Design a protein with these regions (language model features):
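NAD(P)H-binding glycine-rich loop region in Rossmannoid oxidoreductase-like domains
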Residues: 1-27
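A short C-terminal helix-loop "cap" of Rossmann-like NAD(P)-dependent dehydrogenase/epimerase domains
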Residues: 65-68, 98-100, 110-121, 174-185
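Catalytic helix-loop patch of NAD(P)-dependent Rossmann-fold dehydrogenases
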Residues: 17-24, 28-32, 51-95, 102
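A short helix->loop->beta-strand "cap" motif at the edges of active sites that frequently abuts
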Residues: 39-42
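Amphipathic terminal alpha-helices
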Residues: 213-230
Length: 230
C-alpha cells in the first residue's frame, strides 16, 4: 500500500519550483513499486489524486479522460505527475482522493487548512474522509481481496459541499476563524492553476460495494471527533 507522494509545502505551487522531485515521487517511484509488486505477484494499492480534472461540466468518473492532466499545458506539475503515473501503470489498484480531511486538526487536513486560512474561495469540490478511506483499504487486507489487475476508483464522499457550507458547519462546532473573508482565485497570486471538480462515486458504490458517507455527515463526524480530542 503506497501512500507517499509529493504535494508540496505549503501547497502544490512548490511543484512548479521542484518539478524533478514532484515527478520522482508522484510518477517514477510509484511506477517502480508497481513493477516490483507485479514481478513478485504482490497486491498493490496506490493512493493517488483526483486533481486531474477541472470545471463542473459533469461528475467525472474513472473512465473520463483527464482534462487537467499530463497533456494540458495549463495544469499544474502536481496534476501532470499524478496523471503520468496513471498512464504508465498497468498493475494494481489506484485510489483517487481529493482534499482529504480527518478527525484531528492535522496541518495537512482540509478542515485545518480552512480554519487557518484568512482568505477563502467559495467553490464546490469533492473531498475524502480519511477514516473511511482506511476502512475501504482495510477490506482488501482482512478479506484478502486481490489488487493486482489494473483498476482505478474515486474515493470521495458523495454530495460534496461548497466552501460556504463547510464554513457554516465549522462555526456550528465553534471552530471558526474571525478573520475569514471571501476572495477570487486571481487575488491569491498562485503560481500553479488549481483543480476544481466533482468526482463520481458510482464505481465505488456499485463495483466495490462501499457506501461512503455523504460529505456533510463525514464533516460532522470529523468535527465531533476534533472537539472530543481537544
Amino acid at each position: 500500500i503506497n501512500a507517499f507522494g509529493f504535494t508540496g509545502r505549503p501547497n502544490v505551487d512548490e511543484g512548479e519550483l521542484k518539478p524533478e522531485l514532484c515527478y520522482e515521487l508522484n510518477t517514477f517511484a510509484p511506477l517502480k513499486l508497481s513493477t516490483i509488486c507485479q514481478c513478485f505477484n504482490i497486491n498493490y494499492i496506490h493512493i493517488s489524486s483526483g486533481c486531474i480534472y477541472t470545471n463542473y461540466e459533469k461528475e467525472y468518473n474513472e473512465y473520463d479522460e483527464p482534462n487537467f492532466g499530463f497533456f494540458n499545458s495549463e495544469s499544474s506539475t502536481y496534476s501532470k505527475s499524478k496523471h503520468a503515473f496513471e498512464i504508465g501503470c498497468d498493475y494494481g489498484l489506484t485510489i483517487r482522493v481529493r482534499m482529504p480531511f480527518c478527525d484531528k486538526l492535522h496541518n495537512r487536513s482540509y478542515l485545518t487548512k480552512i480554519k487557518k486560512y484568512d482568505n477563502l474561495i467559495n467553490l464546490t469540490n469533492s473531498k475524502t474522509y480519511i477514516p473511511q478511506l482506511l476502512d475501504f483499504i482495510e477490506q482488501f487486507v482482512s478479506e484478502k481481496i486481490e489488487a493486482k489487475d489494473k483498476d482505478i476508483v474515486n474515493f470521495v464522499q458523495p454530495n460534496p459541499l461548497a466552501t460556504d457550507k463547510v464554513i457554516e458547519l465549522m462555526k456550528e462546532y465553534n471552530l471558526g476563524n474571525s478573520e475569514w473573508s471571501w476572495v477570487q482565485f486571481e487575488e491569491l497570486n498562485c503560481i500553479a492553476n488549481r483543480s476544481n471538480c466533482i468526482l463520481s462515486t458510482n464505481k465505488l458504490k456499485n463495483k466495490y460495494e462501499f457506501d461512503a458517507m455523504d460529505e456533510e455527515l463525514a464533516i460532522r463526524a470529523a468535527l465531533n471527533n476534533i472537539l472530543m480530542d481537544e
